[in-house]
């Protein structure tokens, strides 16, 4: 995927409001692969919604979102699987870890889809993020901060 385009996109919850001032909503915007973007705004203005739309997790918006010119509303489940496997990853606010599994098992679930990162690389991230001693610890027995770091490692196991 080389571009993500938003064309007059607006969360449904904001529909009918005349006072929307945004660099994202109700604009034409193209995000290009390899470029860095900062999305910064006040609470309740749609930052998490934007991520959820682009990830295909939610579709309660007006307007059009395209990946490389293709409207994401037309994507099949198989398309989404391939996109999430090869092109896009998301670190959810809710983390979405399996509490009964260990830190390693949670990361390996994602990495097994791509086989992109070696066990050695993943162990290095655990070390770097200060959770190497939690490798075999069930998520339910970890602090929220430790769980966040496991979720970050899991999100990094992508081939892009």
Report each predicted region and the residues it spans.
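Conserved ABC ATPase signature
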Residues: 138-148
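ABC-type ATPase nucleotide-binding domains, specifically the catalytic core motifs of the NBD
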Residues: 14, 108-120, 128
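Helix-to-loop junction immediately C-terminal to a conserved catalytic motif
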Residues: 55
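ABC ATPase NBD coupling module
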Residues: 72-89
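Short coil-to-helix segment of the ABC ATPase nucleotide-binding domain corresponding to the Q-loop/switch region
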Residues: 100-109
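Conserved ABC transporter NBD signature motif
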Residues: 63-72
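Conserved ABC ATPase "signature" region
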Residues: 71, 119-134
């Amino acid at each position: 995927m080389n571009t993500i385009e938003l064309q007059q996109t607006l969360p449904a919850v904001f529909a009918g409001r005349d006072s929307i001032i945004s660099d994202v909503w109700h604009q034409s915007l193209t995000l290009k692969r390899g470029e860095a973007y900062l999305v910064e705004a006040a609470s309740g203005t749609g930052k998490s919604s934007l991520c959820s739309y682009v990830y295909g997790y939610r579709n309660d918006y007006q307007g059009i979102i395209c990946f490389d010119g293709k409207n994401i509303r037309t994507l099949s489940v198989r398309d989404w699987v391939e996109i999430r496997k090869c092109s896009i990853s998301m670190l959810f606010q809710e983390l979405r870890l399996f509490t009964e599994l260990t830190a390693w098992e949670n990361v390996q679930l994602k990495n097994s889809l791509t086989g992109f990162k070696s066990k050695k690389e993943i162990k290095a991230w655990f070390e770097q993020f200060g959770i190497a001693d939690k490798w075999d610890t069930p998520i339910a027995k970890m602090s929220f901060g430790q769980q966040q770091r496991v979720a970050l490692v899991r999100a990094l196991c992508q081939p892009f």
